A protein has these predicted regions:
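Catalytic phosphate/metal-binding cores of nucleic-acid and nucleotide-processing enzymes, i.e., regions
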Residues: 1-103
């Protein structure tokens, strides 16, 4: 962890802060990891699906030491051929990681 990045605790706290920051920057954010039933149905889908100005951002929230499950890695690999200027997939470990998407 770098000195400039504050500790936010668990994955839920990191995710909540990322959602807050992206929404403040004008993104429409759908949280897919809300409850146990939803998590089971959408097991490998990224935690956040975000839309703004024709751009779609898929975000997997992890703690600095958090590891992606194999299904999440597979989903990311399956998405790679479809990524372009209007679709991006990111793993964010700190709320500050969302800053590149503010403009």
């Amino acid at each position: 962890m770098t000195e400039s990045k504050a500790p936010y605790g668990n994955e839920s706290a990191i995710q909540a802060e990322i959602v807050k920051r992206l929404r403040a920057a004008g993104w429409y954010v759908i949280v897919t990891s809300q409850d146990r039933r939803t998590r089971k149905q959408l097991a490998d889908i990224p935690d956040l699906i975000c839309f703004r100005c024709g751009m779609t951002l898929l975000v997997e929230c992890k703690t600095p030491m958090g590891q992606m499950r194999q299904g999440q890695v597979d989903f990311q690999c399956d998405m790679l051929p479809h990524l372009g200027r209007s679709l991006a997939y990111r793993v964010m470990r700190y709320p500050e990681d969302a800053e590149e998407w503010y403009d």
